[in-house]
């Protein structure tokens, strides 16, 4: 489930990915959409610097833990993913 590009995420980053992936898969019934939304959610909290995932300085300004159904829509437009990230 976790794309190769995201394998070395910190524990909390992996939890964010899994949570968004599972919720998006249930909602949209598409693994491609679920993966893209989960990647976007991770990138709201972490950035890759010199091959290591680091928390964003502004990571606490975005909440990835809301319980509303529409919480994934914020992540759809803010970050785009590349084909390498989804592989």
UniProtKB/Swiss-Prot annotation:
Coiled coil: none annotated. Residues 71-87 have a biased composition (Acidic residues). It holds the Pfam family ChaB. Residues 52-87 are annotated as: Disordered. SUPFAM superfamilies: ChaB-like (SSF140376). This is Uncharacterized 10.1 kDa protein in LEF8-FP intergenic region.
